[in-house]
């Protein structure tokens, strides 16, 4: 902190009572020398008053920090907000009092993760914060705090050097990546300079944003690093990170999923790719990753706030289906790269989204909740299906399907416009075939519709199927809004109401096919049922 003290004295000389024309002239004469002195002092490493200077980075042989039964290892009434995730046997979270503040201390060392199998994942002491689990415009998670970086990991290789200070988190639809993927991580890499004895030590840190290129992205192909700024060792830095959803200024019908950071007064905003796939917004902070040496960071003045706004622009979760074959009663299932049939409809590997293949496209992608979209291969001689890692929307000609409504409550999926259909064959293989029978027909079971039959029973529609019009009855629901969506999730009807029933006789927006009626109540609960238009 010598640098900041000297800078304060210099400013006092310029602005204080000693300031005069004569003094100004003398100061200007010495300014280059003084500036050099400041630069030299600033780059000369100072040991922070609460820095861990232990020469050993090994976990204590006593096992005092092993904590084999829990990762939530905390002190009573911690000053820092959030729940601890402690995966290091080197140290536990503790607090120090320096510079007039209470600081949470986060220290980890190379090979100190004893939890994850061991050392398959990097050591960390982080704090997790409850996530904003809605995706409507105005939903966000916001963290603020004050940070001092004292040391970060170093391997001598650029890519593996550095430690993370915070990260934006958030799950997404359509599969791909880990079960709890990072959206972007904020990484500190060391800059070296001399200490008082001339030894090369960490004197400052370059801050980088490691951002995904696509949902679930990891590694060199899946992420990009962007340099943000440099901060000095032990410099007191104000931090703000907000992750959430805002309206796209270029299209009011679209939204942006963002991760906006302010680091030491400098703004670094970033829009997350594939915002329509985002399901939540979360934040973790502390210290994470050390592939060589030790990492230690100090956090103070931490706060957290979240806002959750329901997204009513599309069917809430109703566009996630179990796809059941009419002939066999078995469910379409993603099993690794294969598509198989299962007698059970339980599990996310039987859950699918039917998503438009692109703006203006009449085709759809069939997207697994645990993997990616279905690709069809071969023709009549060697037909096959592959569960890919590709995400929707995708217009590749071997990954697009036409949804055909059979006007009996079932649908068929045609491979593009090739006259071949998703098919459960007699050999129990899921394939595509030119045969048109009940093995090419499928029931779409909405995961929302099948969860709570008591909710569904309170929404009625008659006549159903219909041709000329229909009535929606709302039994025991204090309704606020009625919406009707087609199978692609497009809104075709919306009406605010406080009545117990609605009659619709204008069918101009209703082509033949299946629809989902979604009723939002005053308490924000959503009730849904199916409608078939002939």
Swiss-Prot record:
This is Ulvan lyase NLR42. The keyword Nucleus does not apply. Belongs to the polysaccharide lyase 28 family. Residues 450-534 form a propeptide. Residues 1-47 form the signal peptide. It comes from Nonlabens ulvanivorans. Residues 316-449 are annotated as: Ulvan-binding domain. Optimum temperature is 50 degrees Celsius. GO terms for molecular function: lyase activity; metal ion binding. Ulvan lyase involved in ulvan degradation. Ulvan is the main polysaccharide component of the Ulvales (green seaweed) cell wall. It is composed of disaccharide building blocks comprising 3-sulfated rhamnose (Rha3S) linked to D-glucuronic acid (GlcA), L-iduronic acid (IduA), or D-xylose (Xyl). Ulvan lyase catalyzes the endolytic cleavage of the glycosidic bond between Rha3S and the uronic acids GlcA or IduA, producing oligosaccharides that have unsaturated 4-deoxy-L-threo-hex-4-enopyranosiduronic acid (deltaUA) at the non-reducing end. It comes from the Bacteria. Substrate binds at residues 164, 218-223, 288-291. Disulfide bonds join 59-89.
């Amino acid at each position: 902190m010598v640098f900041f003290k000297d800078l304060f004295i210099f400013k006092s000389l310029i602005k204080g009572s000693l300031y005069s024309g004569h003094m100004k002239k003398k100061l200007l004469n010495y300014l280059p020398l003084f500036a050099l002195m400041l630069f030299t002092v600033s780059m000369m490493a100072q040991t922070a008053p609460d820095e861990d200077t232990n020469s050993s980075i090994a976990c204590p042989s006593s096992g005092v920090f092993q904590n084999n039964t829990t990762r939530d290892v905390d002190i009573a009434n911690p000053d820092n907000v959030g729940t601890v995730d402690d995966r290091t046997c080197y140290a536990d979270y503790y607090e120090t009092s320096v510079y007039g503040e209470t600081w949470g201390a986060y220290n980890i060392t190379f090979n100190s993760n004893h939890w994850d199998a061991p050392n398959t994942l990097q050591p960390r002491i982080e704090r997790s914060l409850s996530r904003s689990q809605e995706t409507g415009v105005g939903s966000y998670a916001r963290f603020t705090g004050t940070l001092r970086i004292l040391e970060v990991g170093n391997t001598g290789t650029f890519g593996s050097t550095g430690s993370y200070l915070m990260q934006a988190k958030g799950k997404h639809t359509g599969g791909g990546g880990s079960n709890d993927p990072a959206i972007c991580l904020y990484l500190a890499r060391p800059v070296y300079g001399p200490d008082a004895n001339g030894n090369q030590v960490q004197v400052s840190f370059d801050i980088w944003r490691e951002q995904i290129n696509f949902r679930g992205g990891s590694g060199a192909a899946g992420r990009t690093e962007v340099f943000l700024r440099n901060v000095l060792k032990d410099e007191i830095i104000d931090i703000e990170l907000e992750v959430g959803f805002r309206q796209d200024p270029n299209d009011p019908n679209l939204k942006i999923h963002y991760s906006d950071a302010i680091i030491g007064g400098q703004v670094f905003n970033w829009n997350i790719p594939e915002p329509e796939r985002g399901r939540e917004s979360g934040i973790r902070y502390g210290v994470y990753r050390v592939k060589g040496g030790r990492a230690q960071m100090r956090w103070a003045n931490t706060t957290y706030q979240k806002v959750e706004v329901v997204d009513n622009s599309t069917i809430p979760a109703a566009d996630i289906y179990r796809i059941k074959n009419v002939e066999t009663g078995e469910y379409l299932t993603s099993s690794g790269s294969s598509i198989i049939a299962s007698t059970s409809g339980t599990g996310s590997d039987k859950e699918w989204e039917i998503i438009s293949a692109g703006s203006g496209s009449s085709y759809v992608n069939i997207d697994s909740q645990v993997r990616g979209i279905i690709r069809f291969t071969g023709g009549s001689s060697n037909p096959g299906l592959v569960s890919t890692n590709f995400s929707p929307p995708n217009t590749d000609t071997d990954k697009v399907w036409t949804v055909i409504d059979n006007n009996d409550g079932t649908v068929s999926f045609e491979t593009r416009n090739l006259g071949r259909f998703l098919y459960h064959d007699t050999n129990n293989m899921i394939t595509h075939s030119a045969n048109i029978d009940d093995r090419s027909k499928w029931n779409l079971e909405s995961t929302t519709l099948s969860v709570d039959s008591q909710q569904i029973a309170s929404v009625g529609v008659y006549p159903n199927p219909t041709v000329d019009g229909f009535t929606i009855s709302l039994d025991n629901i204090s309704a606020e809004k009625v919406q009707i969506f087609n199978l692609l999730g497009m809104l075709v009807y919306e009406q605010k109401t406080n009545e117990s029933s609605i009659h619709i006789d204008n069918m101009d927006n209703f082509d033949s096919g299946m629809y989902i009626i979604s009723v939002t109540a005053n308490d924000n609960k959503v009730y849904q049922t199916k409608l078939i238009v002939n």
